A protein has these predicted regions:
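Short N-terminal helix-initiation segments at or just after the protein's N-terminus
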Residues: 19-23, 54-57, 186-190
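Bacterial Sec-dependent N-terminal signal peptides
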Residues: 1-41, 51
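Intrinsically disordered, low-complexity segments enriched in small/polar residues
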Residues: 5, 28, 65, 192, ...
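Short, conserved sequence motifs used for protein processing/export or organelle targeting and
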Residues: 70, 76-259
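Small-side-chain structural scaffolding
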Residues: 17, 46-47, 56, 113, ...
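Local sequence-structure signature of Cys/Sec-based thiol-disulfide redox active-site neighborhoods
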Residues: 31-80
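Intrinsically disordered, low-complexity boundary segments flanking structured domains
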Residues: 27-29, 60-65, 101, 127-132
Length: 259
């Protein structure tokens, strides 16, 4: 009888505690993720001799884990004084074209990012800037095909404008994932087995792309053909086509397409 009474009293106390009102400041509220209005292009000016660049890569990984690699599209632009173009024995990832972009944007240190072609951003501020750009609405949609075998690459890029009086440029880049090459780490030590992702390889249609103009043409949908001969040393299975449309207001839309 005594045990039964203790059980009843315990249950009553539990019910009372469960019914205790939680203060307004103590309640957990669900915060929905920001709605995505467009994809975002993040150009990471990086280098194999840049000790802080692995930290920037971690920031990219975090953003892509949160939003997806098809939404936050990264390009590792190996360039500048900390870039490395290689020797006969050591693989380098920097390019002359990468240096051209580096100088154009006036990059002063690495790692530095350029988000949606809107200017330089320190990697510690990438998350906030990317989040804001994701909220922007766009009037441009892009789709692409990638065809060919071996070193042959060809296809079409379709750009649809849902607004009149649209002007911009279409830029096509190639990037490669999963390249094992030397990288200086934050402690200054060289890591010969570092895996580099989204490494810029080349621009398919010129340094600054090609003009696209739609004047009073609601729903105009140009189809742009392209053709390119791949470097034999690149791994086709790890290559991506990056296609984006930009104007003076920045990148209007960007996509990536696996080869």
């Amino acid at each position: 009888m005594r045990n039964k009474l203790l059980y009843i009293l315990g249950a009553a106390m539990l019910l009372v505690s469960c019914g205790t009102e939680i203060g307004e400041n103590e309640r957990l509220e669900y915060v929905a993720p920001a709605a995505v209005g467009k994809n975002v292009l993040l150009v990471d000016f990086t280098g194999q001799r840049c000790v802080n660049c692995p930290k920037a890569n971690e920031e990219i990984e975090s953003l892509q884990k949160q939003y997806g690699g098809d939404t936050v599209i990264a390009v590792g632009m190996h360039s500048g004084p900390l870039g490395f173009k290689g020797t006969p024995k050591v693989l380098g990832l920097a390019t002359d074209l990468g240096d051209t972009y580096y100088n154009h944007w006036g990059v002063e240190y690495q790692p530095t990012g350029v988000i949606d072609y809107l200017g330089k951003v320190d990697y510690t501020a990438w998350a906030a800037n990317v989040t804001e750009r994701l909220k922007k609405q766009t009037t441009v949609s892009i789709s692409a095909t990638t065809e060919g075998e071996g070193t042959d690459l060809h296809g079409n890029v379709s750009v649809e404008f849902s607004d009149a009086m649209v002007r911009g440029k279409l830029q096509l880049w190639l990037v490669e994932d999963s390249i094992t090459a030397m990288q200086l780490m934050p402690d200054g030590s060289p890591n010969k087995d570092y895996v580099h992702m989204h490494v810029f390889r080349d621009a398919i249609n010129g340094t600054w792309g090609q003009d696209l103009t739609a004047v009073n043409a609601m729903g105009w949908n140009p189809v742009v053909p392209y053709q390119y001969t791949l470097n034999e040393s690149w791994n086709r299975k790890h290559l991506w086509l990056i296609a984006f449309v930009y104007d003076d207001s920045g990148v209007l839309q960007v996509i990536r397409k696996h080869l």
